[in-house]
Amino acid sequence: MSLIDPRAIIDPTAVLADDVEVGPWSIVGAGVEIGEGTVIGPHVILKGPTRIGKHNRIYQFSSVGEDTPDLKYKGEETRLVIGDHNVIREGVTIHRGTVQDRSETTLGDHNLVMAYAHIGHDSVIGNHCILVNNTALAGHVHVDDWAILSGFTLVHQYCHIGAHSFSGMGTAIGKDVPAFVTVFGNPAEARSMNFEGMRRRGFSEDAIHALRRAYKTVYRQGLTVDQALAELAEPAAQFPEVAVFRDSIQSSTRGITR
């Protein structure tokens, strides 16, 4: 029995693995590739060039791979690449890239993108991230592994969201968020570190204590960023987790959320 509903529309150039499921009224456009075990629900629109990996699930009314609304976009060929084991819930929108940046929007593996979230053009989402309902990423946003963006979080273009970071509900992020940091508010302010997330992921208590001290160095001692980075040199050499925190600050191009 075919796993493609007869009411779905599949472009002849689309490439689907044999066990891909496509629900009624969904449209799989030209240049779309879908890997094995992926399930496309009803009323989904997929536009290419888009490559979707293995064992993903995309729910109804999502629009994946559509043209970017960026006014610089003039119809150039750009792409969207989605990895494996992602869940994309109802009404999600994900746009392809632009030639002015990297020509590609990327979603990694094992991510949960919840209802009505938006991923803008040229954004790069890592692995094991959660974008909760109505979270919206502008163009060129980078989200590192294990980050969690709570409902209605808004992220300004070109911001970098560090690994294992966490945003509270309704947060408006306009600057980079360092790794492990918890932010909340409009505009976003750093409140603490995502210690609960670290414990759930098996971080040692020594590493957590080292990160707690590193956070206080950056946020509680009245130091400039350069002064704080100098203070972090020794603990970063001892704890790789502190090095990740330090490096996420050092590489910031928009300034960090304070």
UniProtKB/Swiss-Prot annotation:
InterPro entries: Acetyltransf_C, Acetyltransf_C_sf, Hexapep, Hexapep_transf_CS, Lipid_A_LpxA, Trimer_LpxA-like_sf
Compartments, as annotated in UniProt: Cytoplasm
Gene3D superfamilies noted in UniProt: Hexapeptide repeat proteins, Udp N-acetylglucosamine O-acyltransferase, C-terminal domain
GO molecular function: acyl-[acyl-carrier-protein]-UDP-N-acetylglucosamine O-acyltransferase activity
A cellular-component GO term for this protein: cytoplasm
Reactions performed catalytically: a (3R)-hydroxyacyl-[ACP] + UDP-N-acetyl-alpha-D-glucosamine = a UDP-3-O-[(3R)-3-hydroxyacyl]-N-acetyl-alpha-D-glucosamine + holo-[ACP]
Primary location recorded for the protein, binned into one broad class: cytoplasm
Gene Ontology BP terms: lipid A biosynthetic process
Pfam families linked to this entry: Acetyltransf_11, Hexapep
SUPFAM superfamilies named in the record: Trimeric LpxA-like enzymes
Alphabetically ordered keywords of this record: Acyltransferase, Cytoplasm, Lipid A biosynthesis, Lipid biosynthesis, Lipid metabolism, Repeat, Transferase
The protein's role, per its UniProt record: Involved in the biosynthesis of lipid A, a phosphorylated glycolipid that anchors the lipopolysaccharide to the outer membrane of the cell.
Protein family according to the UniProt entry: Belongs to the transferase hexapeptide repeat family. LpxA subfamily.
Name of the protein: Acyl-[acyl-carrier-protein]--UDP-N-acetylglucosamine O-acyltransferase
